[in-house]
């Protein structure tokens, strides 16, 4: 019996997707719940699994094709796996010349290899037919990073892609995520009256508190490490309560005030920057916030974030400081009306009670939609965050 292989049902926020990778070819056997094809959307990569044991009979949508929700991708002949197995027996005889061919990399694996300057033929593929999977590329990248500094010779054996002095250009299509990010950035710039206000915060109190309790915190909370982001999320939640307009959104001619704080935290992934959301952050402890962010980071690296985890949010925090950014003007993520930018902690001479003191300082930037948020609200929001972070006991005392 023929079974239709269909694209997943997309949520309303996703119009279509792209066939990223077929893991099976026509004539190849599959088992029930085995991965057949990846569909890339502007938010996540969705996996299509086999509904039954059988053989891939036909591929209707090729890699790179655009597909709609529930659209036919191919056909699976149920129960044909047993008869298809003998046909694969002659393959070893023809395998010899295949060794000379360039390895096949999945899109995610190719991106990781390029970003880490790893030659494709140096990665051992564990996928079907020797295909290099994302996990293979990640393992190769980790192996390269952990290689002893005194043994750089193996990495140098890869031949350069282009001769020195060549004026080389390379044209590649945008990923759906990058295209969607570009679209939303242009939309934000053109549809909002966006402004950015700045302040700076003395990070010494938070750093001292973290240094004092980080070991006990990790032991008490089953290995969850105490970072800086949880303090910023806590401070942002309190500041949003005091300035509800910063937590609101515009819907047509209406202002929607949200009685909850869903905080989006920007996380870097192989596909680009993604923003999973901490739901009801106002009820979360420091440990729950850190644990949630850590879990998001792992899922982002593995490409396992779900659409639900990246949908919604009433306010976003972006930390360019992890990349060394000293100052920036983050762009608001519609339909939200504000975003907080964290930056690098850097020691600077500061005047304190008439004395010059070296303090670890961080610039904070709040970009906001001036159609809804007045300058007074934006400045007050940042001042509240500054006050709470410079006296973190207030976060616990709710004062």
UniProtKB/Swiss-Prot annotation:
| Pathway membership, UniProt | Amino-acid degradation; L-lysine degradation via saccharopine pathway; glutaryl-CoA from L-lysine: step 6/6
Gene Ontology terms: cellular component: cytosol; oxoglutarate dehydrogenase complex
Q: Tell me the Gene Ontology biological-process terms attached to this UniProt entry.
A: L-lysine catabolic process to acetyl-CoA via saccharopine; tricarboxylic acid cycle
Q: What class of enzyme is it?
A: transferase
Transferase recorded as keyword:
yes
Keyword entries, A-Z: Acyltransferase, Lipoyl, Transferase, Tricarboxylic acid cycle
Catalytic activities: N(6)-[(R)-dihydrolipoyl]-L-lysyl-[protein] + succinyl-CoA = N(6)-[(R)-S(8)-succinyldihydrolipoyl]-L-lysyl-[protein] + CoA
In this UniProt entry, the residues modified to N6-lipoyllysine are 43
User: Which InterPro entries does the annotation name?
Assistant: 2-oxoA_DH_lipoyl-BS (IPR003016), 2-oxoacid_dehydrogenase (IPR050537), 2-oxoacid_DH_actylTfrase (IPR001078), Biotin_lipoyl (IPR000089), CAT-like_dom_sf (IPR023213), E3-bd_dom_sf (IPR036625), PSBD (IPR004167), Single_hybrid_motif (IPR011053)
Active site at 370, 374
**Cofactor-binding details, from the entry:** Binds 1 lipoyl cofactor covalently.
How it assembles, according to the record, is: Forms a 24-polypeptide structural core with octahedral symmetry. Part of the 2-oxoglutarate dehydrogenase (OGDH) complex composed of E1 (2-oxoglutarate dehydrogenase), E2 (dihydrolipoamide succinyltransferase) and E3 (dihydrolipoamide dehydrogenase); the complex contains multiple copies of the three enzymatic components (E1, E2 and E3).
Its recorded name reads Dihydrolipoyllysine-residue succinyltransferase component of 2-oxoglutarate dehydrogenase complex
Q: Which organism is it from?
A: Azotobacter vinelandii
């Amino acid at each position: 019996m023929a079974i239709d292989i269909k694209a997943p049902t997309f949520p309303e926020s996703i119009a279509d997707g792209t066939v990223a990778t077929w893991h099976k070819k026509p004539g190849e056997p599959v088992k029930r719940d085995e991965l057949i094809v990846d569909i890339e959307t502007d938010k996540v990569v969705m996996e299509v699994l086999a509904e039954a044991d059988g053989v891939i009979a036909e591929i209707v949508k090729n890699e790179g094709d655009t597909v709609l929700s529930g659209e036919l991708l191919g056909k699976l002949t149920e129960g044909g796996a047993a008869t298809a197995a003998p046909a694969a027996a002659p393959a070893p005889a023809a395998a010899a010349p295949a060794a000379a061919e360039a390895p096949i990399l999945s899109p995610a694996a190719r991106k990781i290899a390029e970003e880490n300057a790893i030659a494709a033929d140096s990665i051992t593929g564990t996928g079907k037919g020797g295909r290099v999977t994302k996990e293979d590329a990640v393992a190769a990248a980790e192996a390269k990073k952990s290689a002893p500094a005194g043994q750089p010779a193996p990495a140098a054996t890869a031949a350069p892609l282009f001769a020195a002095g060549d004026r080389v250009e390379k044209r590649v299509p945008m990923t759906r995520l990058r295209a969607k990010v570009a679209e939303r950035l242009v939309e934000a710039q053109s549809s909002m009256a966006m402004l950015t206000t700045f302040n700076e915060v003395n990070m010494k109190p938070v750093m001292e508190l973290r240094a004092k309790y980080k070991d006990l915190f990790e032991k008490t909370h089953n290995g969850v490490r105490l970072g800086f982001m949880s303090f910023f999320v806590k401070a942002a939640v309190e500041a949003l309560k005091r300035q509800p307009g910063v937590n609101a959104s515009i819907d047509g001619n209406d202002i929607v005030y949200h009685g909850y704080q869903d905080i989006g935290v920007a996380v870097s992934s192989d596909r680009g920057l993604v923003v999973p959301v901490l739901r009801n952050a106002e009820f979360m402890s420091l440990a729950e916030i850190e644990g949630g962010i850590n879990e998001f980071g792992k899922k982002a690296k593995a490409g396992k974030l779900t659409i639900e985890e990246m949908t919604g949010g009433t306010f976003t925090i972006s930390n360019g400081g992890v990349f060394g950014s000293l100052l920036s003007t983050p762009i608001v993520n519609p339909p939200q009306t504000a975003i907080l930018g964290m930056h690098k902690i850097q020691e600077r001479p500061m005047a304190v009670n008439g004395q010059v003191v070296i303090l670890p300082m961080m610039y904070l930037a709040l970009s906001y939609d001036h159609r809804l948020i007045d300058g007074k609200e934006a400045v007050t929001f940042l001042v509240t965050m500054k006050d709470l972070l410079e006296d973190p006991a207030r976060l616990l005392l709710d004062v």
